[in-house]
Amino acid sequence: MLIVADENIPLLDAFFQGFGEIRRVPGRSLDRATVEQADVLLVRSVTNVNRALLEGSKVRFVGTCTIGTDHLDLDYFKQAGIQWSSAPGCNARGVVDYVLGSLQTLAEIEGADLNQRTYGVVGAGEVGGRLVKVLKGLGWNVLVCDPPRQIAEDGDYVSLAQIIEQCDVISLHTPLTKSGNGSTWHLFDRQRLEQLKPGTWLINASRGPVVDNAALREVLLAREDLQAVLDVWEGEPEVDVDLADLCVLATPHIAGYSLEGRQRGTAQIYQAFCAHLGQAPSILLSDLLPPPWLAEVHLNASTDPAWALATLCRSVYDPRRDDADFRRSLVGTVEEQRKAFDLLRKHYPARREIEGLKVRINGESTALASIVSALGAQAI
């Protein structure tokens, strides 16, 4: 069996070496010749997998180590009898940690009280749903917009217009869809961007084209009161450098790049592949993860809750280093910048998720206990 896989997928050998030959290739340069003799294709979101790539090949299983499937032609898969799997929720916690770290940076820059702001979460799936749970657990005022879920299930949802009108912070977590009533392509176009409340913080860690990047650049130039945090970009790995310069935080599509998130994605497609073969999985991710580097955090009961929240969030993720690294890469020719974008992702330093953090409170503090619980850290 020949397995062709994106070279940046972690733990390939640990999970897949028992099935056959593994051939690692750069994800952006996958072509028909590369996959023609493959039985299995394992990719990330940088590879578009469609008829043009697969027709005439031996591929019968496609796995993507990502939440989203907008890079997969699922209609063609069905027509061709190709089984497939994504990794829903694999990096959701990492993205939540990214948003929490970004909020701490924004609050520090603006001297804002995070408790006094109204938060809007657009998209309440694996990522957005977890973020909503954390924000509400912290006692913050949260509005949620997700029209497809509002139709399909009961829930306390609001319209996008209400999000724009009422929220001081808007965090985007929608999939990318380009057609139909639920299209999210340029969901935040010039008109909606111009309608943002004064002082709004806009965070996009979903897909780049959910926000019209050219329009956002012009709106940010015209309105210094707005703050933008972008982890995803239209046309990436090519980035609008002028837009990045206007963002308070800019990063190269790494929001979900926690160690657990990346390895969990591989584990999920391994499990799906085992099911495809009709055999039980024999390898567990828990046996492969190293212990957290930060063993424990001790907080005295008298600790200021706001300081404790900031410290716990930043103990697992502080976006300022990624922002600085990314800005240093935005020099030279466009081709050099494209290569640097991919290199930053390929060689991204490992970071851990907050759910692996153990926190001990010395004494009794309901406020601190609530924060630890809301964040999903382990109280000991």
Swiss-Prot record:
This is Erythronate-4-phosphate dehydrogenase. InterPro entries: D-isomer_2_OHA_DH_cat_dom (IPR006139), D-isomer_DH_CS (IPR029753), D-isomer_DH_NAD-bd (IPR006140), Erythronate-4-P_DHase (IPR020921), Erythronate-4-P_DHase_dimer (IPR024531), NAD(P)-bd_dom_sf (IPR036291), PdxB_dimer_sf (IPR038251). One of its GO terms (biological process) is 'de novo' pyridoxal 5'-phosphate biosynthetic process. The gene is pdxB. Substrate binds at S45, T66, Y257. It comes from Pseudomonas fluorescens (strain SBW25). Pfam families: 2-Hacid_dh, 2-Hacid_dh_C, DUF3410. Homodimer. Its EC number is 1.1.1.290. Belongs to the D-isomer specific 2-hydroxyacid dehydrogenase family. PdxB subfamily. Pathway: Cofactor biosynthesis; pyridoxine 5'-phosphate biosynthesis; pyridoxine 5'-phosphate from D-erythrose 4-phosphate: step 2/5. It comes from the Bacteria. The keyword NAD applies.
